[in-house]
A protein has these predicted regions:
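Solvent-exposed, well-ordered amphipathic alpha-helical segments
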Residues: 5-9, 30-34, 78, 88
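Short, surface-exposed amphipathic charged segments that create phosphate/polyanion-binding patches used
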Residues: 99-105
């Protein structure tokens, strides 16, 4: 999945600043920037390989749609070891809200 959907959602409903990055989207909020990787359709399981790819691209977060993608235990643990957080989109939005991003709807 490209970052298109996430860009559209964040621009239309939040005060976070996003670039047009693909495959890595920079999301800036409250003086902080997270670099987000959204898995491609063939990466419907977030494994250690996907975590390594995201890290190599410079990601700090892997955010995914829980309707078609899942994170394996191995993938989450390896990502954590690499310093990359793995979360569904809903979790990413909750994280942003906890960090001070304002959402309009």
């Amino acid at each position: 999945m490209s970052t298109y959907w996430l860009i559209k959602q964040l621009r239309s409903t939040s005060d976070a600043v996003v670039d047009d990055g693909n495959p890595i989207l920079a999301v800036t909020f409250v003086g902080r920037t997270e670099r987000v990787y959204c898995p491609e359709p063939d990466e419907y399981r977030i494994t250690a390989d996907v975590a390594r790819k995201a890290k190599d691209l410079g990601a700090t977060v892997i955010a995914y749609s829980s309707s078609w993608c899942e994170a394996t235990y191995e993938g989450k643990q390896y990502a954590k070891d690499l310093g990359v957080s793995v979360m569904p989109f809903a979790g990413f939005f909750a994280y942003l809200k906890r960090k001070g991003v304002k959402f309009t709807s």
